Curated annotation (Swiss-Prot):
InterPro entries registered for this protein in UniProt: ACP, ACP-like_sf, PP-bd_ACP, Ppantetheine_attach_site
Entry keywords, A to Z: Cytoplasm, Fatty acid biosynthesis, Fatty acid metabolism, Lipid biosynthesis, Lipid metabolism, Phosphopantetheine, Phosphoprotein
Coiled coil: none
Main location: cytoplasm
Pathway membership, UniProt: Lipid metabolism; fatty acid biosynthesis
Species this protein is from: Rhizobium meliloti (strain 1021) (Ensifer meliloti)
Protein name per the record: Acyl carrier protein AcpP
Phylogenetic classification of the source organism: Bacteria, Pseudomonadati, Pseudomonadota, Alphaproteobacteria, Hyphomicrobiales
Transmembrane segments: none
Localization per Swiss-Prot or TrEMBL: Cytoplasm
GO cellular component: cytosol; membrane
Residue numbers carrying O-(pantetheine 4'-phosphoryl)serine: 37
NCBIfam families (UniProt xref): acyl_carrier (TIGR00517), PRK00982.1-2 (NF002148), PRK00982.1-3 (NF002149), PRK00982.1-4 (NF002150), PRK00982.1-5 (NF002151)
Modification after translation: 4'-phosphopantetheine is transferred from CoA to a specific serine of apo-ACP by AcpS. This modification is essential for activity because fatty acids are bound in thioester linkage to the sulfhydryl of the prosthetic group.
Amino acid sequence: MSDIAERVKKIVIDHLGVDAEKVSEGASFIDDLGADSLDTVELVMAFEEEFGVEIPDDAADSILTVGDAVKFIEKAQA
């Protein structure tokens, strides 16, 4: 797992209070990890702060899984 993926995973664990083994790249924030819409907004804000990237609302709406977040952040930092 890349450094970005590890940091995303830590943020998800901290914000959602889920077990580390549940957090995989294919895990859906809502369907698999029990997040609600407010949780997803807070996760996006945490990703922006941690990685120094801006995630526009339309992009945030397409970040549905841990892997989606990692891919967006990797692309934004490239």
